[in-house]
Curated annotation (Swiss-Prot):
Subcellular location: Cytoplasm, Nucleoid
Pfam families found in the cross-reference section: MraZ (PF02381)
InterPro entries xref list: MraZ, MraZ_C, MraZ_dom, MraZ_N, MraZ_sf, SpoVT-AbrB_dom, SpoVT-AbrB_sf
Annotated protein name in UniProt: Transcriptional regulator MraZ
Keywords: Cytoplasm, DNA-binding, Repeat, Transcription, Transcription regulation
Matches recorded under PROSITE patterns: SPOVT_ABRB
Organism ancestry: Bacteria, Pseudomonadati, Pseudomonadota, Alphaproteobacteria, Rhodobacterales
SUBUNIT field: Forms oligomers.
UniProt record similarity statement: Belongs to the MraZ family.
GO cellular component: cytoplasm; nucleoid
Length: 167
C-alpha cells in the first residue's frame, strides 16, 4: 500500500480554472507516480463520468492503474466492463500538476460540480475529491452526520475494522 491522502482544505479557483492542490496531496501524487522525477510535474487522473456524483474524483497514477487492471480482467463486452470503461477511460481527464502546484480544471468539469470561486478538497485514501464547498456541506456532511447519529454514543469507529482481514 502506497502513501495515502489525508486531510481537507479550501482553495481559491481563479477565472481560468486554476486551483492549488494541498501541498501534502502533491507529495502523495509524486510518490504514487512511477514516472515522476524531481523537477517533473506529477500526473493524476480526474474522473468525472458518473452523473450522480457531485464531485470530481482524483486518482494517483498507481490507483488508476489498479482500477484499469481490474476493468481489463472483466469479460470483454460485459455490461460492467462497458460502464467502467466509459467512466474511467472515456469520462476522465489525465492531467498534471503545474510548476506552482496547481491543477487547471476545464470549464466542463467546473460546470459539472457548479464550481465557481472556491474548491473544497477532501482526502479519501488513495484518491481525493474536489467539491463545491456548499454542496459538500449540504450533501456529504449531512449524510455523514446521519450515519454517525445511527451509532451508539460510545461507538468506536475502529470497530468497523474488526474482521477486515489482517486488521
Amino acid at each position: 500500500m502506497g502513501r495515502r491522502f489525508r486531510g481537507e482544505s479550501h482553495h481559491k479557483v481563479d477565472s481560468k480554472g486554476r486551483v492549488s492542490i494541498p501541498a501534502s496531496f502533491r507529495r502523495v501524487l509524486e510518490a504514487s507516480d512511477p514516472n515522476w522525477q524531481p523537477g517533473d510535474a506529477p500526473e493524476l487522473v480526474i474522473v468525472y463520468g458518473d452523473h450522480r456524483r457531485q464531485y470530481l474524483e482524483c486518482y494517483t497514477m498507481e490507483a488508476i492503474e489498479e482500477v484499469d487492471a481490474k476493468i481489463a480482467a472483466l469479460p470483454r463486452g460485459s455490461k460492467g466492463r462497458k460502464i467502467l470503461e466509459r467512466i474511467f477511460n472515456g469520462q476522465s481527464l489525465p492531467t498534471t500538476v503545474d510548476e506552482t502546484g496547481r491543477l487547471v480544471l476545464p470549464a466542463k468539469l467546473r460546470q459539472k460540480i457548479d464550481l465557481d470561486k472556491e474548491a473544497f478538497f477532501i482526502a479519501s485514501g488513495d484518491t481525493f475529491q474536489i467539491w463545491k464547498p456548499e454542496t459538500y456541506e449540504e450533501v456529504e456532511m449531512a449524510e455523514a452526520e446521519k450515519l454517525m447519529d445511527e451509532l451508539p454514543d460510545d461507538f468506536d469507529p475502529l470497530e468497523f475494522l474488526d474482521g477486515a482481514g489482517g486488521a
